[in-house]
Curated annotation (Swiss-Prot):
One of its GO terms (cellular component) is host cell cytoplasm. The keyword Repeat applies. Transmembrane segments: none annotated. The keyword Cell wall biogenesis/degradation does not apply. This is Interferon antagonist OPG040. Gene3D superfamilies: Ankyrin repeat-containing domain. It comes from Vaccinia virus (strain Western Reserve) (VACV).
Length: 284
């Protein structure tokens, strides 16, 4: 039996098929009638199959809500949700339906799921399987921006730092700016932002990323800076400029980490670094 052309069947042929014992069995390609109806975005056929009992006879390897989430049109997703399918269900790959909406860039479908349950963006069998992390990996700034706008409270810092790590690693500056804007807006510790992966941007000599990072009050003292200051003049200048800014700013100059660090000692021992420091002080 081949159901791949079921969307072209006449009503009489379809009615005969639905009354047969094979109505909900897999065809020669391993798919059900519902699979082909969704693949063709055939809303009428989907409704007919649902009324005939398709959801009570799903194949083990088919996840209709996940499949429908890849469609640009949201009608079938709405119908399946109304029919009682669980939006938090994992498929055989450990993903939710929202994950596939993100993967396809379907913003309207993404909004449909998130409005129903914003926590879905953090559902996944592992942290790497969540829809939020997937959107970051895809560098989809629009979807991540929407996700952040729908979170009613702050979320796990470890998740945020993991996302910042992969963003810096991949050189996605706009995504990093979006995440740091959120991190800054929710920072209530009155301290410099701790970004462990600043060293990664330095090692990659990603000047554009570093320039973006240094627009924020980040902790530049968390990395071992001695070798960097001595090996790369351009990056050394950026670090020293930020250090001088912190020492001059009324908000940051009294922070312990600004007053007590090894940076001044490293600078004092090197003529070129001292000159950079003096020039930065004059400009500040």
């Amino acid at each position: 039996m081949d159901l791949s052309r079921i969307n072209t069947w006449k009503s009489k042929q379809l009615k005969s098929f639905l009354s047969s014992k094979d109505a909900f069995k897999a065809d020669v390609h391993g798919h059900s009638a519902l699979y082909y109806a969704i693949a063709d975005n055939n809303v009428r056929l989907v409704c007919t199959l649902l009324n005939a009992g398709a959801l009570k006879n799903l194949l083990e390897n088919e996840f209709p809500l996940h499949q429908a989430a890849t469609l640009e049109d949201t009608k079938i997703v709405k119908i399946l949700l109304f029919s009682g399918l669980d939006d938090s269900q994992f498929d055989d790959k450990g993903n939710t339906a929202l994950y596939y909406a993100v993967d396809s860039g379907n913003m309207q479908t993404v909004k449909l799921f998130v409005k129903k349950n914003w926590r879905l963006m953090f559902y996944g069998k592992t942290g790497w399987k969540t829809s939020f992390y997937h959107a970051v990996m895809l560098n989809d700034v629009s979807i991540v921006s929407y996700f952040l706008s729908e979170i009613p409270s702050t979320f796990d810092l470890a998740i945020l730092l993991s996302c910042i790590h992969i963003t810096i690693k991949n050189g996605h500056v706009d995504m990093m700016i979006l995440l740091l804007d959120y991190m800054t807006s929710t920072n209530t510790n009155n301290s410099l932002l701790f970004i462990p992966d600043i060293k990664l941007a330095i090692d990659n000599k990603d000047i554009e990323m570093l320039q973006a990072l240094f627009k924020y009050d980040i902790n530049i003292y968390s990395a071992n800076l001695e070798n960097v200051l001595l090996d790369d003049a351009e990056i050394a200048k950026m670090i020293i400029e930020k250090h001088v800014e912190y020492k001059s700013d009324s908000y940051t100059k009294d922070l312990d980490i600004v007053k007590n660090n090894k940076l001044d000692e490293i600078i004092s021992k090197n003529k070129e670094l001292r000159l950079m420091y003096v020039n930065c002080v004059k400009k500040n």
